[in-house]
Amino acid sequence: MEVIPNINSRRAGLIARIKLIVRGDLTTGNYDPVLAESFSGCIPTRSAFQFSGADGVESAFPVEYVMRMMNDWAKGECNPYIKIQNTGVSVLIEGFFDPPINATKAPLCTDKVNVLLNTTESTGIVLSDINKIKQSIGVDCRPFQACLIVNCFVRLPIVQLAFRFVGPSDPGRTTKLLDSAIAAYDAKIRQRRKRNLQIMESKSQDHTSDGCIPIPIIDETHRSGITGESKSLFGMFKNIASGECVTTIRIPRYIVMLWIFSVLLAMVTWGSYRLYS
């Protein structure tokens, strides 16, 4: 049976995915074991991984791409930081999920994209600063349009760093892929809303089947269709119920006397019948 990967399985093996995009002339150093597993809610507080390059190495490190992978693995609960240091014998690249105390940052701007590191000196870049840098130097901030990389030229005792924004090799194809991803996301949202609406309708039908029948409400259109006679009849019942309507019946006096005499005659006749029987 084929197992469909979920979001947790896609986030697993972060260190392996980072190794796939880092060039082979950079040696993998120590890394936190949790990077080989799915995110468990615990973010490493110290150096998460290390890469190093010996004297004479000329290599490019995808700074922004790696930090965005780290942010995705941690479900956005971090602000990744990449530290680059000249150790005196090599260049050391370290990844942190949050900037450490007194973390140095590269002063990147339009006129300055190169940094020279002497022995024991270091610099770095934070993910949250990348969009600010893009805006300041006029780089396209849309996803997949420009990605920050750093070229390391190790010439001990000096390490030269050159920060560059590189775009896709085929901008048209990248734009189409981005548009299709946005369309797929919108379709997923619409499907989720439709499913929630169906669930709500089924719940309302269940309440109706249990005996909870909604009371119909007469709108103004139906109310206007009531005739004048019906309105007067309703008004009379309303007045009677509220005690506002008092009816007086006038009966002639002779009819009253005749009715009393008939009652007395019936009583005398019934008494005589009982006495002689």
UniProtKB/Swiss-Prot annotation:
Tell me how this protein sits in the membrane. Answer: Single-pass membrane protein
Task: Provide the membrane-side ranges marked Perinuclear space in the record.
Answer: 1-250
Transmembrane feature ranges: 251-271
- Residues in compartment: Nuclear: 272-277
Name the major location.
host cell
What InterPro entries does the record point to?
Answer: Herpesvirus_viron_egress-type
Is-annotated flag, keyword Transport?
A: no
Question: Which Pfam family, any one, appears in the UniProt record?
Answer: Herpes_U34
Transmembrane helix as a keyword of this entry, yes or no, is yes
One GO cellular component term noted in the UniProt record for this chain: membrane
Where in or outside the cell it occurs: the entry states: Host nucleus inner membrane
**What does the UniProt record tell us about how this protein is modified after translation?**
Phosphorylated.
Regarding protein family, the annotation reads:
Belongs to the herpesviridae NEC2 protein family.
State what this protein does: Plays an essential role in virion nuclear egress, the first step of virion release from infected cell. Within the host nucleus, NEC1 interacts with the newly formed capsid through the vertexes and directs it to the inner nuclear membrane by associating with NEC2. Induces the budding of the capsid at the inner nuclear membrane as well as its envelopment into the perinuclear space.
What is annotated about its quaternary structure and interactions? Forms a heterohexameric complex with NEC1.
Cited HAMAP family: HSV_NEC2 (MF_04024)
Record-given protein name: Nuclear egress protein 2
Q: Which organism is it from?
A: Gallid herpesvirus 2 (strain Chicken/Md5/ATCC VR-987)
